[in-house]
Amino acid sequence: MLFRSWREERLEDLKRMARFDCLTNNADRKAIHCILGRVGRVWGIDHGMTFHDEPKLRTVIWDFAGDPIDPELISRLRALAERLPVDIAALLSEAECAAVGDRARELAELGSLPYDETGRRYPWPLV
């Protein structure tokens, strides 16, 4: 079979990617950027349109808006909001580091994945 949909069987992986997109402010997640590897791992292929200090989130994984974030991850988000790991901070500008902290804090406070209130943050094709 040349193509088969694996979306339903890999929902947790896609939700993890959605949380990552929100945290990193991914500006261009398309369905083609979600690839199922040979051993069943989901890979997110990105091109560097992430970590911007201005809100630019565009993702095809809005399906999970409103889904709760588990308590363990919320505590990790709070820790990240307080201090970004040095190896990541070294790659980002001060403004980008502050924005990651702000997004981590906002996600922890919200406790769920956000909704696209504009209705315009959908790159194509959808997942």
Model-derived regions, located:
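Phosphate/dinucleotide-binding and metal-coordinating scaffold of catalytic cores
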Residues: 1-127
